[in-house]
């Protein structure tokens, strides 16, 4: 599909969103995951820029009960009610409502392409909303391209994404981080990224872990200034 992704240890993909201050406040600093066509977001005929909060919103539960249904989850409402209306107030019209792929990923120990094909290309359910989380495939493709043949989980760290930890800008690396994708072989497990770099399906959704909102900029949003560094992020209007 026609897409562009930022990959490697620290690309110049910073963007200031939701603030006009001359120095972008940390809470308004995001990073561009990439530019994607309909295959990923479901909006026909549009290439959209997807961004993710640079720092964590906090540690949040994926759900408050043993269910991994995204549409009814606590996380979905945390992002699309609390975060969207409070933090992004006045900027909602600059965010595109898209189709998030919610059928998930049924197996671990595979490469980013295998993950992308299952959770994105062959998705069997979607949820229409403005805000979501990153997909495991987003995390996989954020590593330097030489690692794209590695598995996101293996028993040996030289064979999985622990080896790519220093060359993947999406790895937060403090504690585990939630993704939007579920394990459909279970009724209760979402996927998370471990702080050492592996992909896991080992946790209850009630665990409170790093949460970084992700969303797509509306196609009407235009570039204004900036070079994409953390101190001179892209500015949009």
Feature map (PLM): residue ranges:
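Collagenous Gly-X-Y triple-helix signature in extracellular proteins
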Residues: 1-237
């Amino acid at each position: 599909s026609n897409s562009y992704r930022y990959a490697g240890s620290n690309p110049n993909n910073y963007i200031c969103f939701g603030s006009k201050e001359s120095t972008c406040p940390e809470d308004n600093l995001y990073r561009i995951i990439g530019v994607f066509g309909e295959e990923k977001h479901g909006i026909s005929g549009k290439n959209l820029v997807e961004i993710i909060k640079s720092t964590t919103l906090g540690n949040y539960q994926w759900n408050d009960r043993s269910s991994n249904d995204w549409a009814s989850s606590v996380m979905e409402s945390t992002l699309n009610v609390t975060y969207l209306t409070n933090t992004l107030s006045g900027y909602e019209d600059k965010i595109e409502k898209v189709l998030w792929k919610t059928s998930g990923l049924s197996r671990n120990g595979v490469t980013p392409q295998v993950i992308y094909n299952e959770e994105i290309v062959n998705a069997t359910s979607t949820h229409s909303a403005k805000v979501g989380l990153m997909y495991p495939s987003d995390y996989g493709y954020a590593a330097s391209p030489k690692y794209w043949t590695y598995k996101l989980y293996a028993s040996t760290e030289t064979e999985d994404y622990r080896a790519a930890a220093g060359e993947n800008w999406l790895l937060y690396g403090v504690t585990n981080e939630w993704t939007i994708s579920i394990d459909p072989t279970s009724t209760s497990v979402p996927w998370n990224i471990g702080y050492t770099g592996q992909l896991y399906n080992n946790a209850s959704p009630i665990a409170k872990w790093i949460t970084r909102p992700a969303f797509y900029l509306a196609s009407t949003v235009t570039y204004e200034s900036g070079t994409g560094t953390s101190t001179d992020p892209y500015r949009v209007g």
